Design a protein with these regions (language model features):
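Glycine-rich beta-alpha loop elements in corrinoid/cobalamin-binding modules
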Residues: 1-119
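Local cysteine-cluster metal-coordination motifs and their immediate loop/turn environment
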Residues: 159-167
């Protein structure tokens, strides 16, 4: 797996750079069984469509609620000799997991989303976000890995525009 946190829309181009530098095909449709499953999570997954072609799946809401089940599913699937596409179909059946390749978004002339059609029975008609109601039950890393280097520590974010330009 390659997990990417989507904190800000302005960081989307960095995702492409990470994939390119890792020699992972940019588009999920071009990946083989030998490539990692690219997973998106974080606040920007509430509007995943602009970057959906680059991700195999998204956690909708808080991934801590479901990631153990997803990992167990993956391990069992690999042990059984399953392929990438069948794993993604099984993953889509888990609550809070959105697999873009299993849906056909349709847009209006103005570019807004008009409908969202599942392409297979495993894909639910809608994907509901997951919320961890009691944070005390969550597993957290005691000592997160954050590189102590200038490029990481000496930076700031400047947001020039906020909100949707389409009203």
């Amino acid at each position: 797996f390659l997990g990417i946190t989507l904190q800000y829309e302005m960081c989307y181009t960095n995702i492409l750079q990470v994939l390119e530098l890792s020699e992972i095909p940019l588009r999920a449709a071009d990946r083989s069984d030998n490539d990692p499953i690219v997973i998106g999570g974080g606040p920007c997954t509430y509007n995943p469509e602009p970057i959906a072609p680059f991700f195999d799946l998204f956690y909708m809401g808080e991934g801590e609620v479901i990631y153990d089940q997803l990992l167990d599913l993956y391990l069992a699937h690999k042990e059984a000799g399953g392929d990438r596409s069948s794993f993604l179909k099984k993953a889509a059946a888990l609550p809070g997991i959105y697999v873009p390749s299993l849906y056909e978004p349709r847009y209006r002339e103005d570019g807004t989303l008009s409908s969202f059609e599942p392409l297979c029975p495993e894909a639910p008609a809608s994907v509901r976000r997951l919320v961890m109601s009691v944070l005390d039950r969550a597993d957290f890393i005691d000592t997160p890995l954050v590189p102590f280097i200038r490029v990481t520590q000496d930076r700031s974010v400047l947001e020039l525009m906020r909100g949707c330009i389409r009203g």
